[in-house]
Amino acid sequence: MWCRRLACLLSVPCQHTRHRLLGPSCGRRTFTAAVARWHHTAPESLSCAWQLHGDHLELRYADTLMRFDFVWLRDHCRSASCYNAKTNQRSLDTASVDLSIKPKAVRVDETTLFLTWPDGHVTRYGLQWLVKNSYEGQKQQVMHPRILWNAEIYRQAQVPSVDCQSFLETDEGLKEFLQNFLLYGIAFVENVTPTKEDTQILAERISLIRETIYGRMWYFTSDFSRGDTAYTKLALDRHTDTTYFQEPCGIQVFHCLKHEGTGGRTLLVDGFYAAEQVLRQAPDQFELLSKVPLKHEYIENVGDCHNHMIGVGPVLNVYPWNNELYLIRYNNYDRAVINTVPYDVVNRWYTAHRTLTTELRRPENELWVKLKPGKALFIDNWRVLHGREAFTGYRQLCGCYLTRDDVLNTARLLGLQA
């Protein structure tokens, strides 16, 4: 999923540029040759090798070729004087580190890198820690493991709902729910008492509620009490919410408390699955959608509600080091005037947007569900688009937004990668 793998990691030749090598290797020899060369932890072993350059250390370990700037190596020292292991915070003043610093001696054994600095301070790094935290290592990892889906994939997965009592009272139930949510971007809780108060208790099990211009917990009917198409009986096309916030709300909770009529099914589309298809078909268009910033806007003047919100960002948001998609900002209702895009890019942007929209609207990518009293739906608003078919009669939903950081925090505390 949008991870660029390093190719031919072990095919990099030794560089014969002139740098003075300092200090002993593995405690056996002192290298003073003027030509950079690889040094190994043992004569017969190629499991770990390193060489010094003018401003960085090059290390080959666990099939990964890594480069570490000397300032980085000094700044990230985990010694007691540089790092507080109790608070997991840096103690070293980074601004005090000489930007031209070089180690006085370097030694590597089977598990550890040792660096001695000009002032005599010794830094130790576990080789596995370096692999995990190197730029090269991070390029090969995903921040958030996911299963991308269309309707058929999701149905075949038979992802179970979690019982409300298990969700509220056991870590096992909560962990199962969060695992489903992290992998698929949606998750259901069943047997919830159909009241706003009980839905709030459910939501607060995993996160603080994010208060917005809509309040904390809200009732959702077709009375047009707010200046938004959602407060009608009309169909809603697929979209993500609060694109007009600088940081869109991370998670949305829906619970249908009552519906006396027909229609009103909820539409769910995995935006990341659609974006993956764009990446495969037209990578240049994917890149354009990830780089061109757009404004989204919400202007409201209904009753006592007066708001003017503006959020700016590209449709697709990716981590730059591994090209992993982490947020889709897609809402054609709230997209503002396009005035942040140069004339000669506008048509290419519309073409890319059309390609993405085509994927989002493919019938095979649409998962339709009927929300009923007692079944709460949690949606990753940074990933899964939602919509609604038109309906008749009285329909009442309640729900809220959750702070994404708190949901992910809960997941990590339960041992999940999030």
From Swiss-Prot:
Q: Name one GO molecular function term.
A: iron ion binding
Task: Quickly give the catalysed reaction.
Answer: N(6),N(6),N(6)-trimethyl-L-lysine + 2-oxoglutarate + O2 = (3S)-3-hydroxy-N(6),N(6),N(6)-trimethyl-L-lysine + succinate + CO2
Q: Subcellular location, in the record's words?
A: Mitochondrion matrix
Pfam families the UniProt entry points to: GBBH-like_N, TauD
Task: Give the primary localization class.
Answer: mitochondrion
Q: Which InterPro entries match?
A: AlphaKG_dependent_hydroxylases (IPR050411), GBBH-like_N (IPR010376), GBBH-like_N_sf (IPR038492), TauD-like_sf (IPR042098), TauD/TfdA-like (IPR003819), Trimethyllysine_dOase (IPR012776)
Quaternary context:
Homodimer.
Concerning PANTHER family, the annotation shows: GAMMA-BUTYROBETAINE HYDROXYLASE-RELATED (PTHR10696), TRIMETHYLLYSINE DIOXYGENASE, MITOCHONDRIAL (PTHR10696:SF51)
Q: What is this protein called?
A: Trimethyllysine dioxygenase, mitochondrial
The root-end lineage is: Eukaryota, Metazoa, Chordata, Craniata, Vertebrata
